[in-house]
Every structure is written in C-alpha cells, then in structure tokens.
Amino acid sequence: VMGRHAYHHALGTHRAELDEIWSRRDDISWHNPAGFWVGRETLYAYYADAKAKQDEATLKLMAKFNPNIEVKPENFQMGALMMHSLTTPLIEIADDGKTAQAMWYSLGQVTNAGPDGTATGVWMHERYAVDFIKEDDGWKIWHFFVGNDLGCEAGKPYAEYIPQEPAGE
C-alpha cells in the first residue's frame, strides 16, 4: 500500500491515490507540518484538487516562456520531481487482524522548475505514521501522519537550517 502511495505521490496523481488505496470511511485523515485534514471530501479538496491547481498554475507560468508547452492535465507534473523513499518499516497488525499501525522513515526531495529554466529543490527527512484498516478489497490507509524532522533547500548547508514551529503552535 505504501509503495503505491509513493508511486502516486511522485506522479502527482493524488486523486487516484485517494480512490485506490485510502479507506472508504468518512473519518480518514492526513496530517503534515502545514495542518490536519479530516474527511474524504476535505482530503480531496486539499490533497488532490489543490495539488492539481498548483500544478496547473506552474504549467501556465512555464508555458508563458515556452509556447511549445501545452497546458493540459497530462502535463501538470512537468517541471516537478517528487520522490519520498520508504525506509525502516515497522508494521504491527492488531490481534483481531482488522487494523494495523506502521511507521517508516522517508528521505525525500521535491524539485520544481521555474519559468526561467532554473530549478529549486528541497530535501525532506520525514517520519510517516500510518493507521491501516482492512476492507473487503484489502488494506487501506485510514490515518496518515507526516512529521518533518528536517527540510531545507538543496545546495545549502544543513547547519544553516532554522527549524520552524509546527503549524498551529
């Protein structure tokens, strides 16, 4: 399941991810340093639709400077590269076999191209804590927590990184 999450996240196909590997329950949740979202419609709005709008805006900006770039959904990830590897899995299935809890460490990066052809990149060292629930068609993500240990611009020394307060504090 988490391998499919990493795949969808890298492609930016968050709507397909929500449809395929997340629980059908109404109380699914996603937490990252920017905030906490609960409910299927809320996750569609934040995790899927907002990402697509961001990708479209970036693509429109790039197309202004390069008329060969077509602004269409198939190109929304153009100029972006996301990768979040999954390491050190720790998975425990409840005695009743209906739920599971798991943790991973993720070393990732996000790179975005600017309209002028330059790129910016960010390194991310994160912890994932995920609750799974077993449904008729297999294990599904129920709750997903992303904790950021370190995130800094690529090319800058880690020692210059200044930690930010978590959202809401």
Regions found by a protein language model. Name each.
Residues 144, 166-169:
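Non-globular disordered terminal and juxtamembrane segments underlying protein topogenesis/assembly
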Residues 84-86, 122-128:
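Short, surface-exposed coil-to-beta transition loops
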Residues 118, 160-162:
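Flexible, surface-exposed loop regions and adjacent strand-edge segments
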Residues 108-122, 151-152:
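Short, cysteine-centered beta-strand-loop-beta hairpins and adjacent loop/turn segments enriched
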Residues 1-11:
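Short, aromatic-enriched amphipathic alpha-helices that serve as compact interaction elements
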Residues 99-103, 125-159:
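Short beta-strand edge/turn micro-motifs at domain boundaries
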Residues 15-105:
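A solvent-exposed, acidic/Ser-Thr-rich amphipathic alpha-helical stretch
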Residues 9, 22, 106-108, 145-148:
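Short beta-strand segments enriched in hydrophobic/aromatic residues
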